[in-house]
Amino acid sequence: MQLYSSESESDDSQYWVDWFLGLKGNEFFCEVDEDFIQDRFNLTGLSHEVPHYSQSLDLILDVLDPDLPEEVQDEVEASARHLYGLIHARYILTAQGLYKMLEKYKKCDFGHCPRVLCNGQPMLPVGLSDIAHTKSVKLYCPRCEDVYTPKSQRHASIDGAYFGTSFPHMLFQVYPELAVPKSQERYIPRIFGFKVHSYSATFKKQDVYKEKQKKRLQGAEAESKNKLAIT
């Protein structure tokens, strides 16, 4: 039995992960190494979050008992998709996972920033929460440092927890050479050539806040380095 054969046009020998990644709307996901999935340490705590956990894991690994009762097949398939997403969030923080997502980033698989002044900057998927069923996935632009809703509804409906809140920032920590200069350009509303005062005041407040945040982060980084030096 193959629970996913009804939506797949390929032959019966197709692996579940290949089938899942081939579904429209799943282009943001990368392939999680089977060794990572089989290491139960990497799955710690997930059994409490996923119904039919054992059967779902077996389905992902293509070792599911073919005699699974028909009345639970749909539930197991849905749980397998959810489980893969949660595993994916952990995997893309590993060296192998970061590299695979880096390759997709280089190919602009996640799209370009819609902000005109970012000049087509490639984006990265990010979650606004690490808790499943809370927020859908967003796209993070490293140039303007803002997040956007994916254009496609297929992508916009993906759970943000499948990518997590740390992924894009971890990627640039591991690959600092990919860091892009932050956008300093800002559209300024004008009427007959004069800046609109209310917007100018807002921009000034934003700049002050941004500078305070930058100093706070620099201070925290320096403190962290001092602690490491002492130890």
Swiss-Prot record:
Which Pfam families does the UniProt entry name for this protein?
Answer: CK_II_beta
Q: Which UniProt keywords apply?
A: Phosphoprotein
Role played = Regulatory subunit of casein kinase II/CK2. As part of the kinase complex regulates the basal catalytic activity of the alpha subunit a constitutively active serine/threonine-protein kinase that phosphorylates a large number of substrates containing acidic residues C-terminal to the phosphorylated serine or threonine.
Post-translation: what modifications? Phosphorylated by alpha subunit.
What is a single molecular function from GO for this protein?
protein kinase regulator activity
Phosphoprotein: present as a keyword of the record?
yes
* InterPro entries for the chain: Casein_kin_II_reg-sub_N, Casein_kinase_II_beta-like, Casein_kinase_II_reg-sub
GO terms of biological process kind: negative regulation of transcription by RNA polymerase II; positive regulation of pericentric heterochromatin formation; positive regulation of silent mating-type cassette heterochromatin formation; protein phosphorylation; regulation of transcription by RNA polymerase III; signal transduction
Q: Does the keyword Phosphoprotein apply?
A: yes
Q: Which family does it belong to?
A: Belongs to the casein kinase 2 subunit beta family.
- Please name the source species: Schizosaccharomyces pombe (strain 972 / ATCC 24843) (Fission yeast)
Pull one GO CC term from this UniProt entry: cytoplasm
Task: Give the quaternary structure.
Answer: Tetramer composed of two alpha chains, one beta chain and one beta' chain.
- How is this protein named in the record? Casein kinase II subunit beta
Cysteine disulfide partners in this protein: none
